[in-house]
Regions:
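ATP-binding N-terminal substructure of ATP-dependent carboxylate-amine bond-forming enzymes
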Residues: 1-99, 103-104, 108
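Alpha-helix termini
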Residues: 56, 80, 103, 130, ...
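Residues at the C-termini of beta-strands that transition into short coil/loop
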Residues: 50-52, 73, 97, 127, ...
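Active-site nucleotide/adenylate-binding loops and adjacent lid/helix of ATP-dependent enzymes
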Residues: 2, 15-21, 25, 61-62, ...
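Short, surface-exposed linear patches
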Residues: 42-47, 69-71, 90-94, 115-117, ...
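Phosphate-binding core of ATP-grasp and ATP-grasp-like enzymes
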Residues: 173-175, 179-182, 187-221
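Flexible, glycine-rich phosphate/dinucleotide-binding loops
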Residues: 30, 55, 102, 132, ...
Length: 221
């Protein structure tokens, strides 16, 4: 994956001009207010782009007067859609559309992490119940089944045996959407009732936090 070069300053009519930053939001939370304040303190012009009220005219030659769009949208579908449009318009986005699309697909994300040498869970993708059962035999049980796309711990399941895995996957097949025909499978990690969330910038962990819960799904505690 190639890194995206983001602008830091611009020249207009031969004179240096401040960066014009568009901040895409669903709600102005405390974090977004801090970002806007920090940008203003650095002489960056900011425009709040409210996802629910904005309209993107795809056929107009006019473009929003921004040099960079920072995605702080809560709704992934809306945020990803807006970023793709700005990307087509030649306006850089943060995160890049490539990064957003990678994070939206667990299969692609797992492949990217493995390719980058990042330690991760044993993970496999299968496309039939019989091949998924082979994964269960190799990884052992319990086996975790996740949707390819999704967040907040939704639609996660723990199969404790081959029989329960078969039943679970048969139910997924009946849901009808193409996402449920791809079986994303991970080994189960026996851990304390917690999740560790780390924030990495430039290859360095700058902060981390525990999320504690009694349920085995702890990432949304």
């Amino acid at each position: 994956m190639t890194a995206t070069a983001y602008p830091t300053s611009f020249s207009a009519n031969g004179n240096d001009a401040p960066m014009r930053l568009g901040v895409l939001v669903s709600h102005l939370r405390e974090e977004e207010k801090l970002i806007l304040a920090a940008a203003g303190a650095r002489g960056i012009e900011t425009t709040v782009l409210q996802d629910r009220s904005m309209v993107l005219d795809l056929t107009s030659p006019a473009r929003p007067a921004v040099d960079l769009v920072l995605d702080r949208c809560v709704a992934h579908t809306r945020g990803a859609c807006v970023l793709r449009v700005f990307d087509r318009w030649g306006i850089p986005t943060l995160n890049s559309t490539q990064a957003v699309d990678t994070c939206d697909d667990k299969v692609v994300m797992s492949a990217a992490l493995a390719a980058a040498g990042v330690p991760t869970l044993r993970t496999a993708v299968a496309f039939s119940i019989e091949s998924a059962l082979q994964v269960g035999e190799a990884f052992g049980y319990p086996l975790i089944v996740k949707p390819v796309s999704g967040s907040w711990g939704r639609l996660l399941a723990k199969a404790n045996s081959p029989d329960s895995l078969r039943t679970l996957l048969e139910q997924k097949q009946q849901l009808g959407t193409h996402h449920h025909g791809v079986f994303y499978l991970q080994e189960y990690i026996h851990k304390p009732g917690r999740d560790i969330r780390s924030f990495v910038v430039g290859g360095e962990v700058i902060a981390a936090s525990y999320r504690n819960a009694e349920h085995w799904i702890t990432n949304v505690a």
